[in-house]
């Protein structure tokens, strides 16, 4: 393995970790409660992680390992997280994170909470699955992935299982659903 330049060897692991976060195009920001987050490209989609989460910490460790085949020292990791957190809070934009569902620009947006971070956009004209929505959603560990909607379904098929006397009642129930 070639010898590292002296200046490169003197840079702390914390500094290297901070630079790697920037190089990976992570967007640091704070939410409406002033909590630091990162918007990170994972495979082919974007995810939002709290900076102090285990997931972000593990990702940070993997960045250094992939870059230098070294594990970060505990103090370096703590220092880097503190600086990243500070940059998110004081230099990052404030972005409102929504929880599961929100109304935005004439559409209802519903987070499917699935592995691909897909969202359903619902308008008067129908619905579509969006992979890069204009709004961001907060995720919690207890949230389960939702069923992905299917265009081949027929909501009228529910009528055969309903015991409703009047046609208007069926319509009212279907509108409610």
What residues fall within each predicted segment?
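Extended aliphatic helical segments
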Residues: 21, 27, 42, 51, ...
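P-loop NTPase catalytic core of nucleic-acid-dependent motor ATPases
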Residues: 39-47, 125-177
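Generic detector of solvent-exposed, compositionally biased contiguous segments
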Residues: 3-8, 77-95, 146-156
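Short coil/turn segments at secondary-structure boundaries
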Residues: 31-33, 97, 171-175
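Long, basic/Gly/Ser/Thr-rich N-terminal segments
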Residues: 45-127
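N-terminal accessory targeting/assembly segments
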Residues: 2-76
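Alpha-helical structural motif
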Residues: 13, 56, 76, 80, ...
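Phenylalanine-focused residue identity feature
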Residues: 29, 33, 56, 90, ...
């Amino acid at each position: 393995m070639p010898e590292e330049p002296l200046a490169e060897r003197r840079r702390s692991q914390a500094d290297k970790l901070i630079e790697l976060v920037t190089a990976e195009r992570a967007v640091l920001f704070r939410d409406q409660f002033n909590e630091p987050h990162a918007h990170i490209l994972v495979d082919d989609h974007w995810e939002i992680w709290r900076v102090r989460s285990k997931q972000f910490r593990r990702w940070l460790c993997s960045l250094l390992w992939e870059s230098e085949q070294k594990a970060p020292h505990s103090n370096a990791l703590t220092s880097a997280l503190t600086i990243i957190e500070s940059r998110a809070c004081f230099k990052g934009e404030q972005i409102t994170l929504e929880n599961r569902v929100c109304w935005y620009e004439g559409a209802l947006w519903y987070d499917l909470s699935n592995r691909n971070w897909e969202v359903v956009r619902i308008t008067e004209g129908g619905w579509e699955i969006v992979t890069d929505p204009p709004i961001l959603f907060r995720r919690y560990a207890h949230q389960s992935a939702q069923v992905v909607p299917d265009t081949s379904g027929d909501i009228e098929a529910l009528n055969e299982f309903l015991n409703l006397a009047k046609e208007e009642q069926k319509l009212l129930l279907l509108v409610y659903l």
